[in-house]
């Protein structure tokens, strides 16, 4: 066992003394059992994580019952909804790297035999997956689960995205103060990750098809008995996998990454999943080309349209059969998935999900009646984004296949929000928000406030937004993000000027500014070099080391420094 490194031999008597002092070892024979880390992310200010202490206690009990010794540690967490629209959002994506580094540190410093990961929200889930790929110790994931959808006084289904869009609607005068306050009080009724197909739930669903969780991980409610039983069963399975030496990199292969993107397409997941899944591939040692994602989109039908793209919540998806029903449906179309891959259950993806039929065809469409024949995400290329950009086509009105408009440029999120709120932004505009990428932001903040304000003001079909920043999973509308290279790295988005004509072509997956190359070349000659906005602390180090969105926004040490 790995843990023998800290508990076997006379020279480790001091370490054994310290281990006895923890109270986790009930008898001398416990030294012969596997040591299992519980990597938790309990935190009081994140509603998706307030219940994770209870779930960790269930995991501990089950791990002991299975014949191993549990040791819990915690990571940090950032609530993107609370951190939105101010300096806190600069820390959201960078927190993913802190989580990965912290988990790696504890796991490797103490030579654990296996790890039980309990994530739930936004950057915590991918951060823990990065740690699992990096340490490659037998592991299993069981997230905290989604919250129930809210309900307004008028019986309207609510999610957090409803609340963000309500801000724009209230400013526009289209809803009353009473309606606004009612929504605020009822949009998030329970603990759990926000109820729609936002980043947290997107990643928790993708973990199912990656093979890192038990079935229904992505949709079973946080407050359900099923969630608690899932924790128990996952703990038993982890101890079994430790004995069988089944490791994360045995499970997360290139084919698994393909299948994660296929499920993402079928469910119209958050654009952030592209960023995180590319980072996971990078950590697993898999060289993954963005062009591959478009090929997957072309062969994968869009089967389940979930909030913010519809009124359906994650609980509705669960009641309709959950992720297993979607996987089962996709397996019926040859070449869409790689179903004979091994998963943490010890069974293949096919064995886990075969026969799990759709229970509600309104929520999950069958193969012969999809929302669209192609997936809900697209990678765009062109002279604005030579290394790619991402759009959630499932969140765009189906009538829009191309959009051409006049650029109105902003060098920060806050400038853009002010212009939208004071009606400087009008129908026919393409809002360009730049210097908000991983390096430029720094931290690649989410542009939920401007996109929500555009939709809330009734301009969702008349105004587009493009950015080297990213979006919340709650974003909908004509919103193109992750433009690479970013402006701070000299990307072409920095060369756009007010009034330039920009075309977003969803059919051909292109993003172009309609200016001759010689004009863009002259503009580049006069471009002012980017200077880092933050000079001290973690964000300064992050700015120095982070890569562009097309590589997952991971941190890499330059070769000349190694």
Swiss-Prot record:
Its cofactor is [2Fe-2S] cluster; Mg(2+). It catalyses: (2R)-2,3-dihydroxy-3-methylbutanoate = 3-methyl-2-oxobutanoate + H2O; (2R,3R)-2,3-dihydroxy-3-methylpentanoate = (S)-3-methyl-2-oxopentanoate + H2O. It comes from the Bacteria. Its EC number is 4.2.1.9. Pathway: Amino-acid biosynthesis; L-isoleucine biosynthesis; L-isoleucine from 2-oxobutanoate: step 3/4; Amino-acid biosynthesis; L-valine biosynthesis; L-valine from pyruvate: step 3/4. GO terms for molecular function: 2 iron, 2 sulfur cluster binding; dihydroxy-acid dehydratase activity; magnesium ion binding. Gene3D superfamilies: IlvD/EDD C-terminal domain-like. Mg(2+) binds at residues 80, 122-123, 446. Keywords: 2Fe-2S, Amino-acid biosynthesis, Branched-chain amino acid biosynthesis, Iron, Iron-sulfur, Lyase, Magnesium, Metal-binding. One of its GO terms (cellular component) is cytosol. [2Fe-2S] cluster binds at residues 121, 194. It is an enzyme of class 4 (lyase). Signal peptide: none annotated. One of its GO terms (biological process) is L-valine biosynthetic process. Disulfide bonds: none annotated. PANTHER family: D-XYLONATE DEHYDRATASE, D-XYLONATE DEHYDRATASE YAGF-RELATED. Belongs to the IlvD/Edd family. Homodimer. Functions in the biosynthesis of branched-chain amino acids. Catalyzes the dehydration of (2R,3R)-2,3-dihydroxy-3-methylpentanoate (2,3-dihydroxy-3-methylvalerate) into 2-oxo-3-methylpentanoate (2-oxo-3-methylvalerate) and of (2R)-2,3-dihydroxy-3-methylbutanoate (2,3-dihydroxyisovalerate) into 2-oxo-3-methylbutanoate (2-oxoisovalerate), the penultimate precursor to L-isoleucine and L-valine, respectively. This is Dihydroxy-acid dehydratase. It comes from Staphylococcus aureus (strain USA300 / TCH1516).
């Amino acid at each position: 066992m790995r843990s023998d490194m800290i508990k076997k031999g006379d020279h480790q008597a001091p370490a054994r003394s310290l281990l006895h002092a923890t109270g986790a070892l009930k008898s001398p024979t416990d030294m012969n059992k596997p040591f299992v880390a519980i990597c938790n992310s309990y935190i009081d200010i994140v509603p998706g994580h307030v219940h994770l202490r209870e779930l960790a206690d269930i995991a501990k009990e089950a791990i002991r019952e299975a014949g191993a010794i549990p040791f819990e540690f915690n990571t940090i967490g950032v609530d993107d909804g609370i951190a939105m629209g101010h300096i806190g959002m600069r820390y959201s994506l960078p927190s993913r790297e802190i989580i990965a580094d912290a988990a790696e540190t504890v796991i490797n410093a103490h030579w654990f035999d296996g790890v039980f990961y309990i994530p739930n929200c936004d950057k915590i889930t991918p951060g823990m997956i990065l740690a699992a790929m990096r340490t490659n110790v037998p592991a299993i994931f069981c997230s905290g689960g989604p919250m129930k959808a809210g309900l307004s006084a008028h019986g309207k289904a609510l999610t957090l995205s409803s609340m963000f869009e309500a801000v724009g609607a209230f400013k526009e005068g289209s809803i009353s103060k009473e309606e606004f306050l009612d929504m605020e009080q009822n949009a998030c009724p329970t603990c759990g990750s926000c109820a729609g197909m936002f980043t947290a739930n997107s990643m928790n669903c993708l973990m199912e098809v990656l093979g890192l969780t038990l079935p229904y991980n992505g949709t079973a409610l946080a407050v359900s008995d099923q969630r608690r039983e899932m924790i128990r069963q996952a703990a038993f399975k982890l101890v079994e996998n430790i004995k069988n030496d089944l490791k994360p990199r045995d499970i997360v292969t290139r084919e698994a990454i393909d299948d994660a993107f296929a499920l993402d397409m079928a469910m119209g997941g958050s654009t952030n999943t592209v960023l995180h899944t590319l980072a996971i591939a990078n950590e697993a040692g898999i060289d993954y080309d963005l062009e591959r994602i478009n090929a997957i989109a072309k062969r994968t039908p869009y089967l389940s349209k979930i909030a913010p793209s519809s009124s359906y919540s994650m609980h509705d998806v669960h009641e309709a059969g959950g992720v297993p029903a979607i996987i089962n449906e996709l397996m019926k179309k040859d070449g869409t998935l790689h179903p004979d891959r091994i998963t943490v259950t010890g069974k293949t993806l096919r064995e886990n999900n075969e026969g799990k039929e759709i229970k509600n065809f309104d929520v999950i469409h069958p193969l012969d009646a999809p929302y669209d024949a192609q997936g809900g995400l697209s990678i765009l290329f062109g002279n604005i984004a030579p290394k790619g950009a991402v759009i959630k086509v499932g969140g765009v009105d189906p009538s829009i296949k191309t959009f051409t408009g006049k650029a109105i440029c902003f060098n920060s999120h806050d400038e853009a929000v002010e212009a939208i709120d004071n009606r400087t932004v009008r129908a026919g505009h393409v809002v360009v928000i730049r210097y908000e990428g991983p390096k430029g932001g720094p931290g690649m903040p989410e542009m939920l406030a401007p996109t929500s304000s555009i939709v809330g003001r009734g301009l969702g079909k008349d105004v587009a937004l493009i950015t080297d920043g990213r979006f919340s999973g709650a974003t909908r509308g004509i919103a193109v993000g992750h433009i690479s290279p970013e402006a701070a790295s000299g990307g072409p988005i920095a060369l756009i000027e007010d009034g330039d004509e920009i075309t977003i072509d969803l059919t051909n997956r292109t993003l172009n500014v309609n200016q001759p190359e010689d004009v863009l070349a002259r503009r580049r000659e006069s471009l002012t070099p980017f200077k880092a906005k933050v000079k001290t602390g973690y964000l300064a180090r992050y700015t120095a080391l982070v890569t562009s969105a097309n590589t997952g926004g991971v941190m890499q040490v330059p070769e000349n420094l190694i």
